[in-house]
Regions:
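Short, Lys/Arg-enriched N-terminal segments with co-localized hydrophobic residues
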Residues: 1-12
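Bacterial N-terminal signal peptides that target proteins for export
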Residues: 10-20
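Extracellular/lumenal and peripheral-membrane lipid-interaction modules
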Residues: 32-199
């Protein structure tokens, strides 16, 4: 059996050592991050938002126009369009009753909200929600929907002010259990929410 001899010069050894050192520190920093903060991904927020699908509400002006709203397909984009804000999209199915009889419309909504962490509840809320864009089909319903949008906005704002978008659980993972116990606030980064354990 032959033994293969490998001769490494000093420069190669230095490069290998530096590479291993960099890898060690990268792993160390990653481990430290897990001990000092918890990250909630966009995907996790969207999975939690799915629980708010099929939100239903009656809105309008009594005696003039009333609408039954069904909200579906909620999705979030975290800190991408605007720093420290969450952009939500969703579909609204609307059945309108007015002096002109029953009518139906579909709205594609775009909303923005401020993520806020409630330390006592261990929950993330989407506060001060605002509808920033609404596409209506059929187009002939656009004027009616425009008059109803402020009522829809207020209804959704009130709902998300009271209902958390994401609640930390001690059962899902050790990291999440630590976050629920030691969380100090909330930071918004593109694509994720970061909960630090220290001030």
């Amino acid at each position: 059996m032959r033994c293969i001899s490998i001769n490494l010069d000093e420069d190669t050894m230095k490069k290998a050592f530096l590479g291993l050192t960099a890898l060690f520190f990268a792993v160390l920093v990653s481990g430290c991050n897990q001990l000092t903060q918890y990250t909630i991904s966009e995907q996790e927020v969207n999975q939690a938002l799915a629980k708010h699908n099929n939100y239903e509400k009656d809105i309008g002006v009594a005696g003039l126009v009333n609408a039954h709203i069904l909200l579906t397909d909620l999705n979030s984009q975290i800190g991408r369009e605007e720093p420290d804000r969450v952009t939500l999209t969703g579909k609204a199915k609307i059945n309108v009753t007015s002096l002109f009889g029953p009518q139906e419309a579909d709205m594609q909504l775009k909303m923005k909200a401020q993520p806020v962490f409630d330390v006592q509840q261990g929950a993330v809320y989407l506060r001060d929600l605002e509808i920033v864009d609404a596409q209506v089909q059929p187009e002939k319903m656009a004027a009616v929907m425009k008059s109803l949008t402020p009522y829809l906005n207020q209804s959704l704002k009130s709902y998300f002010n009271q209902k958390p978008a994401y609640v930390l659980s001690v059962d899902r993972s050790k990291g999440e259990a630590l976050a629920k116990k030691f969380a100090k606030g909330l930071q918004v980064e593109p694509g994720q929410l970061v909960i630090p354990f220290t001030q």
